[in-house]
From Swiss-Prot:
Keyword GTP-binding: no
Family: Belongs to the zinc-containing alcohol dehydrogenase family. Quinone oxidoreductase subfamily.
UniProt organism field: Bacillus subtilis (strain 168)
Gene3D superfamilies: Medium-chain alcohol dehydrogenases, catalytic domain, NAD(P)-binding Rossmann-like Domain
Enzymatic class: oxidoreductase
The keyword Oxidoreductase is annotated on this UniProt entry: yes
UniProt keyword list: Oxidoreductase
Disruption phenotype: Cells lacking this gene show up-regulated sigma X activity.
EC number: 1.-.-.-
One MF annotation (Gene Ontology) recorded for this entry: oxidoreductase activity
Protein name: Uncharacterized zinc-type alcohol dehydrogenase-like protein YogA
Length: 329
């Protein structure tokens, strides 16, 4: 089967499309013939930090396809079922948070291939109203957004959500989900084009990430910040979050180390919360939520499997708005 392999050199230089053996599912596993898949910033992080001594891996956490073969002991799904892949491994109950969530696409083989073998409980019936391209980019980004907003951020109708750095799959899902429950949404971006797109998709306010936030927000305070930026903007949040507000962190695109006045945290009793990926329970709840509101992913571009390197380059350069998809045929 054809697969997107990372091996050897760090970054995109170690990326190639190769023919690799296709194996059979083991006990409790299913083999899915993939129709589509999606890229995530996590993939870039893995490639950047991989050494030449590390074993090769098939990238990709998101995907959708048709079950072609089932292993012994599988009773919850059948051959020819159309499925979307729940990418988190060994995390079923929301309360049982693992130290570091395991996920498809590093170190275990991922979805940027013609086939993938996964535990049967990770093969979830595909929402019928979604196209293959839409279903393929859905899983990790939508799950991350759902957990960040509702499990961790406890966002409610009428509250004000701030999404710094609009443009990623997670950010666009969060925009749709927040508007679906009746929240007010402000977004930031250095790109005027991305700000305009966000407003067309329903954002209430959009402004430059490095403009004067006091002027832009006009005194409006924030209930929840959904942060993927990290240190570049983090100290700014405390000036605009309401007392007892929530800052939910799921990324660190500008670096790992934070510095902010501690009194700005404890006097207004601001809650800083970390989140990553999500559980099986949350994945089912997310699918029910998007089905209820008939939410669809924003697809930036679709590439054939053979052009995965070109797709990753677009993501690395920060040009995307929404999800970047891969199709197998």
């Amino acid at each position: 089967m054809k697969a997107v392999i990372h091996n050897g050199k760090a970054g995109l230089l170690g990326l190639s499309v190769q023919d690799v053996p296709s194996t059979k599912p083991g006990y409790g596993e299913v083999k899915v013939k993939l129709k589509s898949a999606g890229l995530n910033h996590r993939d870039l992080f893995l490639m950047k930090n991989k050494s030449e001594q590390d074993p090769h891996m098939i990238l990709g956490s998101d995907g959708a396809g048709i079950i072609e073969e089932i292993g012994e002991g599988v009773k919850n799904v059948t051959v020819q079922t159309e499925v979307v892949i729940f990418p988190t491994l060994n995390w079923d109950l929301t309360e049982n948070v693992p130290p570091v969530p395991e996920i498809l696409g590093g170190p275990s083989d991922g979805t940027l291939a013609e086939y993938v073998i996964i535990p049967s409980q990770n093969a979830i019936k595909k929402p019928a109203y979604l196209s293959w391209e839409e279903a393929g980019v859905l899983p990790l980004s939508a799950l991350t957004a759902y957990r960040a907003l509702f499990t961790k951020g406890q966002l409610k109708k009428g509250e004000h959500l701030l999404i710094p750095g609009i443009g990623s799959g997670v950010a666009t899902y969060a925009l749709f989900m927040a508007k679906a429950i009746g929240a007010t949404v402000s977004v930031t971006s250095r790109s005027e084009e991305k700000r305009k797109k966000a407003l067309k998709l329903g954002a209430d306010y959009a402004f430059d990430s490095y403009s004067n936030w006091d002027e832009q927000l006009q005194g409006k305070k924030i209930d929840v910040v959904l942060d993927s930026i990290g240190p570049a903007l983090f100290s700014e949040y405390f000036r605009h979050v309401k007392p007892n507000g929530r800052i939910v962190s799921f990324g660190a695109s500008s670096g790992d180390n934070l510095s902010f006045p501690v009194r700005s945290l404890f006097f207004p009793q601001v809650n800083v919360l970390g989140t990553s990926m999500g559980s099986g329970e949350e994945f089912q709840a997310m699918l029910a939520f998007i089905d209820k509101h008939k939410l669809r992913p924003v697809i930036d571009r679709i590439y054939p499997l053979e052009k995965a390197c070109e797709a990753y380059k677009r993501m690395q350069e920060g040009r995307q708005f929404g999800n970047i998809g891969i199709v197998m045929e």
